[in-house]
Regions:
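Polybasic/polar functional segments that serve as interface/processing modules
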Residues: 1-115
Length: 115
């Protein structure tokens, strides 16, 4: 993921979003559902109904950036709320994009090379 400025806030848009939406449609969702300005520099994260697709909308000061990710297996961990927003740290966003449960991260065993 692209490095975010230190003061950037990350917002999960709770519930599910129509993943057919692009830049303008997702910006409109951020405005209507969260009463937020999508051009303020915050990051807005949206999830589809099935839970295997995420879209991330971010205004970097020059234009809107849209990142999409689809998991080949499993679903992204998402808040139970049907509406509103949940704040994340940039580190939690990285975990979310990696498919890790950002609510309760668990250290996993990393195998070492066999000699």
């Amino acid at each position: 993921m692209i490095g975010l400025p230190a003061n950037t806030r990350v917002w999960i848009v709770a519930g599910h979003t129509d993943m057919r939406k692009g830049f303008d449609g997702l910006a409109a969702v951020a405005q209507s559902a969260l009463a937020a300005n999508p051009f303020c520099g915050h990051v807005f994260v949206f999830r589809g109904r099935r839970g295997d697709i995420l879209k991330v909308l971010w205004f970097d000061g020059q234009g809107l950036m849209l990142l999409a990710k689809r998991l080949e297996r499993g679903r992204f961990v998402w808040p139970q709320a049907d509406s509103g927003a949940v704040a994340l740290s940039p580190a939690q966003l990285s975990m979310l994009l990696e498919g890790i449960d950002w609510r309760m991260p668990v250290r996993t065993h990393r195998p070492e090379l066999a000699a």
